[in-house]
Amino acid sequence: MRALFLIYLILSPFRAVSRTLLENHEGLNVGSGYGRGTNLPPPSPASSPPSKEVSNSVSPTRTDEKTSENTELVMTTIAQGENSNQLFPFLTSSDNYQLASFKKLSISYLLPVSYVWKLISSSSFNHDLVDIFDTSSDEKYWNRKPLSPPSPKPADGHRPLQSY
């Protein structure tokens, strides 16, 4: 029971990972904005940061400053993602997306499960995990003689009390 609970605890975060991978594969959650898909049109020029071609007499508005900050945030996020891709070059394989997602899930799922399984099998409660095909332990259990009740012995050298 404890082993099943540990496996459930390990698997629960990866349901969201697999759901996200599926959405990204279908193009539902791809984009630089929060939940912005690939099917949406690009942002309008009014919301983009002011270009250098605009005269310097026009001061940028407050929304333009926020947009440029958001753009910088997105660019730093993309740069961080590229750095992680350099660490694990096989995670982003454009020619075979399913293989890349399988490798990513195997690293994030199979390694922790095998580690926890080693802990369970080497721990002190491995007697709970009985081999179902091992009949020798069953024979020892069912063929065991019942314990006989303890024989009445005198306590501390005194005679046992007799019932009248």
From Swiss-Prot:
Sorted UniProt keywords: Glycoprotein, Hormone, Hydroxylation, Plant defense, Secreted, Signal
Regions of compositional bias (Basic and acidic residues) in chain numbering: 155-164
Induction: By methyl jasmonate in leaves.
Modified residues (4-hydroxyproline): 42-43, 45, 49-50, 149-150, 152
GO MF term set: hormone activity
Modified how: O-glycosylated; contains pentose side chains.
Tissue expression from the record: Expressed in leaves.
Residue span(s) of the pro-peptide: 19-35, 54-142, 161-164
One biological process term in Gene Ontology: defense response
Subcellular localization(s) per the UniProt record: Secreted
Role, per record: Activates a lipid-based signal transduction pathway in which linolenic acid is converted to jasmonic acid, a potent activator of defense gene transcription, including proteinase inhibitors.
Protein name: Hydroxyproline-rich systemin B
The species this protein was found in: Nicotiana tabacum
